[in-house]
């Protein structure tokens, strides 16, 4: 170990300090927005308001569910980890509320068409109830539907083993951050300033521990935590990711690595764009734009620094997808596209973003960590 043993609890303890209590209270109050959406849908089902009013109210509710946490984070001097956690919860709530509104809108339209005599042989009746919404809000899915596949029982022994794995790999992730990433970042320069060769050396040196942390994060979140949540709720659909590590193109990677978000994007962004006559390329551009906005919110708001590095990083995936598609079509039997993905996305892209945000935050704070 080049820097000696550097394990400490400061990084994690900072996220449980008294100054972060407003963020905890904000997180605990987020369920008010699903409750408001439920009341709107209940009134809409009873025809107490027009469709225009329903859509307007849902826009207000979903917008408030994002702006409220943003304002709380910006007003409080909270730790970065606490801010990221709150923003991720807020983004999940926003996506679930959009899906809830879209699905109920479709069900109302189908019910009305049946009442008017169209497809009268099919029963499109549905019930807006708080139980289904509550289950959806805690289930490991972003797409609302009236029912989900359910497992027969909860495997308690399996659940205990997964909890142990979660503790172990979370600890490993913290160890790598404290022992390797923090010293490298603190001894680095701004990647867009100073000596070019030294900057490249820092990025490449950071790439290995950063990759390990990212893989640990993926394993903890998608393989362990979402399966734990699914097991507790007896949620039957466990397809949270596919073999993204074998992706030969960037767009294939984005279709495989985060299945809940991918399914949400396809159902609520991509297909609605196509149904409204937009070309496929424009639909893809809109999907990446929305993804870029939320990536930027999850990083920039906790940093209180809007330099749009995360936004640009996601939007850069579009030309990178075109490049990897070209390479895959030209060299069909090679893994050149896969190597390009690993190089640009994992080895260069993520360490660059870490260094950019770190040094911009340090510059804003006058160099104090």
Language-model-detected regions and their locations in the chain:
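Membrane-lumen (extracellular) interface motif
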Residues: 1-24, 40-54, 69-85, 176-212, ...
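Alpha-helical transmembrane segments of multi-pass membrane proteins
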Residues: 54-65, 259, 280, 287-292, ...
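Hydrophobic core segments of alpha-helical transmembrane domains in multi-pass membrane proteins
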Residues: 83-92, 288, 310-317
């Amino acid at each position: 170990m080049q820097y000696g043993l550097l394990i400490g609890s400061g990084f994690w303890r900072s996220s449980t300090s008294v100054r972060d209590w407003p963020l905890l209270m904000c997180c605990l109050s987020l369920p008010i927005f699903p409750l408001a959406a439920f009341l709107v849908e209940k009134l809409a089902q009873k025809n107490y308001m027009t469709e225009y009013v329903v859509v307007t109210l849902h826009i207000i509710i979903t917008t408030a569910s994002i702006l409220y946490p943003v304002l709380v984070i910006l007003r409080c001097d909270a730790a970065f980890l606490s801010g990221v956690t709150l923003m991720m919860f807020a983004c999940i709530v926003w996506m679930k509320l959009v899906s809830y509104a879209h699905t109920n809108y479709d069900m109302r339209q189908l019910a009305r068409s049946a009442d008017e005599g169209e497809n009268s042989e099919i029963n499109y009746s549905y019930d807006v109830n708080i139980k289904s919404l509550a289950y959806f809000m805690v289930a490991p899915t972003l797409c609302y539907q009236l029912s989900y596949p359910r497992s027969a029982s909860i495997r308690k022994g399996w659940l205990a083993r997964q909890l142990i794995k979660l503790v172990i790999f979370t600890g490993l992730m913290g160890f790598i951050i404290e022992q390797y990433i923090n010293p490298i970042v603190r001894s680095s320069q701004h990647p867009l300033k100073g000596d070019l060769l030294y900057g490249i050396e820092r990025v490449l040196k950071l790439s290995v521990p950063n990759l390990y942390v990212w893989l640990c994060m993926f394993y903890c979140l998608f393989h362990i935590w979402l399966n734990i949540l699914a097991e507790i709720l007896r949620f039957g659909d466990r397809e949270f990711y596919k073999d993204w590590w074998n992706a030969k193109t960037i767009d294939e990677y984005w279709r495989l690595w985060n299945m809940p978000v991918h399914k949400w994007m396809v159902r609520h962004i991509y297909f609605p764009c196509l149904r409204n006559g937009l070309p496929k390329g424009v639909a893809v551009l809109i999907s990446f734009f929305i993804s870029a906005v939320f990536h930027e919110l999850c990083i920039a708001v906790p940093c209180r620094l809007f330099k749009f590095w995360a936004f640009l990083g996601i939007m850069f995936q579009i030309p990178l997808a075109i490049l990897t598609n070209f390479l895959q079509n030209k060299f069909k039997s090679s893994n050149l596209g896969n190597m390009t993905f690993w190089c640009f996305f994992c080895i260069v892209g993520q360490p660059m973003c870490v260094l950019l945000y770190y040094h911009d935050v340090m510059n804003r704070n006058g160099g104090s960590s």
